[in-house]
Design a protein with these regions (language model features):
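Small-residue-biased structural context
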Residues: 1-192
């Protein structure tokens, strides 16, 4: 599998997380309960898999090699800006989850779940839009064979560094299992 195909494979996982985030948001807006712990798990996956691992591979390995090919630097600049948007949404979600958790510890009622619902929805929209644009870009790279075998091998080595930076293969596998756990929760059951 090429490094480009590897990134598109990650996008399949990331989109599944987007479905979970959207479902959580929809349920919260409908005043239905979603366990705080489940939303915290989704937040961890956003931070560790999407940001540290996947965006790390793109930002530290893939984009530096492809940015000077056929004027791709403007596309890559936009993707980097979008990555920062995703990070900001995830941080704002985390901030609201900390407040919610604090209210639980103190035995008080968390006043409004609307900010959590809003940031989950924003993240789901970000994921859908961003991965669609990146897949179009990656397909262009693949179709035009813009990466040499040597470049592919070099990027692959950096991918391994990104995997180690995010906790290694066992941690990535754990994050995959956590997403499967979320997908099988009762509040996800009526998702088509």
């Amino acid at each position: 599998m090429s490094v480009t195909s590897d990134l598109m494979k990650d996008h399949l996982f990331v989109r599944r997380l987007g479905v979970v985030a959207q479902r959580c948001s929809d349920k919260l807006y409908a005043n239905e309960d979603i366990p705080l712990e489940d939303i915290e798990v989704a937040s961890v996956i956003m931070e560790e898999f999407v940001d540290v691992f996947h965006h790390g591979k793109e930002e530290k390995a893939y984009f530096p090699v492809t940015k000077d090919k056929n004027g791709f630097s403007e596309d890559i600049r936009k993707f980097l800006i979008e990555h920062e948007l995703g990070r900001r949404i995830a941080r704002m979600l985390r901030r609201e989850l900390v407040l919610w958790r604090k209210s639980v510890r103190e035995g008080s009622r968390y006043e409004s779940k609307e900010p959590v619902a809003r940031f989950l929805k924003s993240y789901a929209v970000f994921i859908s839009d961003h991965t669609t644009k990146e897949d179009t870009f990656f397909n262009l790279i693949e179709d035009k064979k813009k990466l040499s075998v040597e470049e592919d091998k070099m990027i692959r080595k950096y991918y391994d560094v990104c995997k180690d930076h995010s906790g290694g293969g066992p941690r990535i596998e754990e994050l995959l299992r956590l997403l499967e756990y979320l997908e099988h929760m009762p509040w996800m059951e009526d998702v088509a």
